[in-house]
Design a protein with these regions (language model features):
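Accessory terminal regions of nucleic-acid processing enzymes
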Residues: 1-307
Length: 307
């Protein structure tokens, strides 16, 4: 059975400290290369404290508020007979203190105890993108959530987990069974990652997009001093100069394109009047007039789109 560490609000100092030196469900998704939110390299820097933990977003806050509704829906439609949902806190594996789980609910067969769960429930809120999720009732939620509940099942020693998702397109439920082979590999990768943390060995970032590496460096250096640095690497200097040149050219091209676009729309507006489309003598469409609906449901002022 897993060992309870405590029950703290998500994002609280105690919650963050419990996760600092341990590997949780979202962490294992990053370590295994399945997370769309962060890489091994980013996770390493967060664990080492070289960048701050991610702040709570509006979407995360919304998920906190809708979680009880999704749990109630799951209880009404999918909770197995003879089981109950229990709120829970932060746990670790009984033999691996570094393996952490923070599930939304435990599924128990004793309404008065959470010590021996039979399953795990993870709740997600997403505003759109139904195509990223499988069909209701299948076993294929997005890979990073699949990895998360696999990790939780391993901590608690249970054989299945459900993922309940609430979105603008309704509710869906995914039933995931424990994958022992994948978990064996995941534990091995997690132990290697922890060793790299302890030894201060930074993961290879050669496959990281430059934009992501830049974002990390910005977070690592939040202050501005009067110091001046000299860059003496010729390749770096050439790349920086080329980037500055391309940036300036793009700005000039964008400004020129905007001038031409405005001039074209001025001409079109006079020709088109209230017409929907403008065409050339051979029938090629040049532009279309459209109108977006306002909050009152009425169409707004028409605008021209160039084809």
């Amino acid at each position: 059975m897993a060992v309870a560490l405590g029950s703290w609000p998500d994002g609280s100092p105690e919650w963050l400290e419990a996760r600092r030196s341990r590997i949780g469900g979202s962490d294992i998704a990053a370590i295994m290369g399945l997370s769309p939110w962060q890489s091994r390299w980013q996770l390493w820097h967060r664990k080492r404290g070289t960048i701050d933990d991610k702040p709570s977003s509006d979407l995360m806050e919304a998920g906190h508020y809708v979680e009880p509704a999704a749990a109630s829906w799951y209880a009404d439609h999918h909770l197995p007979e003879g089981t109950w949902l229990r709120n829970t806190g932060t746990w670790v594996h009984r033999c691996r203190d570094w393996q952490l789980a923070n599930p939304d609910r435990l599924i128990v067969d004793n309404p008065h105890s959470e010590r021996h769960p039979v399953g795990v429930l993870e709740i997600k809120f997403t505003p759109n993108n139904p195509g990223q999720w499988g069909r209701d009732g299948t076993d294929n939620p997005p890979p990073h959530y699949w990895a998360q509940v696999q990790w939780y099942m391993d901590v608690f020693g249970v054989g299945w987990a459900d993922v309940a998702v609430l979105s603008t397109w309704g509710f869906r439920c995914f039933h995931v069974k424990r994958n022992y082979e994948w978990l064996s590999l995941a534990r091995h990768e997690a132990e290697n990652f922890i060793a790299m943390l302890e030894l201060g060995i930074e993961p290879d970032d050669s496959h990281e997009p430059a934009g992501r590496r830049y974002a990390i460096e910005r977070l690592r250096h939040p202050d501005i001093t009067d110091e001046q640095v000299t860059i003496d690497d010729p390749d770096a200097v050439n790349l920086i100069a080329k980037a500055a040149q391309l940036h300036a050219s793009a700005k000039d091209a964008s400004a020129e394109a905007k001038e031409y676009e405005d001039a074209a729309k001025d001409i079109l507006a006079k020709y088109m009047g209230n017409a929907r489309t403008a065409i050339t003598p051979d029938g090629t469409t040049l532009a279309t007039r459209r109108a977006r609906k306002g909050r009152d449901g009425q169409p707004g002022t028409p605008f021209i789109t160039l084809n």
